[in-house]
Amino acid sequence: MSAEASLAELRDALRAAGARPRHETLMLRAWVRGLPLDAFARSEDAQLPLALRRALPELAQRFAGLVTVLSEHRGGDDTLKLLLRLTDDKTIESVLLPGDGVCVSTQVGCAVGCTFCMTGRDGLMRQLTSGEIVAQVAMARARQRVRRVVFMGMGEPAHNLDNVLDAIELLGTEGDLAQKNLVFSTVGDRRVFERLPQGAIKPALALSLHTTKPELRAQLLPRAPRIEPAELVALADEYSRATKYPTQYQWTLLEGVNDGDDELDTLATLLAGHYAVVNFIPYNTVDGADFRRPSWTRAAEMTRYLHRRGVLAKLRRSAGQDVEAGCGQLRARHARVAQSQRA
């Protein structure tokens, strides 16, 4: 794991350089907003001590070096896909979304092994530190306005819960991001439903459902916790009622797999009366996976059907399809190129 990259260790580095609590807060506030570390400490009453000012170049280099851009790829929809290198030369992906959003990674690889996702093919390599997670947001904010952070990149946030929640707390306080605009995505894990309500910052919840059929879900998400869809909805709904914002149910559309009328009918019944929104997401092609996306016409029909049944549904155009913006695709291509160059 990257040395000295947790938020606690970064705080220690600031203190060791001479930062007092007020300076530490101001410097972290500047960093998480994509600004120079001393951006909020230039007035006379907040001026940094001399020793800390002298340490600024080294500190700035350390913070900026947590993630560095290896390559960037802009899509026709104005999505910007970034391949990032960590200090141990592992690579992850972040996606700057059109408008004011960023999708960040929480792990190098993933242990869930979703059959329609590239990231899980190599398994889990390591956890990202809380500092590395926040660094992706800081990097994004240095490039564009960011008002929404979704934890839907590489990795399963529930499997790196402490670091993700530490990052969320900083983003929701010094980062000045609304709680509802911090979106915690998970395949469903009981620890999530226990821990999220306890935090001072309570993010919105996105639940990767993908099907209402337990057996099919076990096939599509082979290492996700075995929790019945109905129980997942009940757990998510309890959290949504407490936070006053809806659960987002993610549903990757796979032709002939989870786009049938039987799925739609069961889904409409399952979510009736619940505080929820369904996000239909057309499948992003993955090499070697025998899946296809349904036609846009069919996907739109599914959305309209749920509307008629009283369930809010949205049809999302997969961001950056022309720049391999599906989780892990850009990283996998980079690995193939690197391997061929070594051969």
Predicted feature locations:
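Alpha-helix N-cap/helix-start and coil->helix boundary motif
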Residues: 111, 189-191, 214, 320-324
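Canonical Radical SAM [4Fe-4S] cluster-binding loop centered on the CxxxCxxC motif
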Residues: 97-131, 139
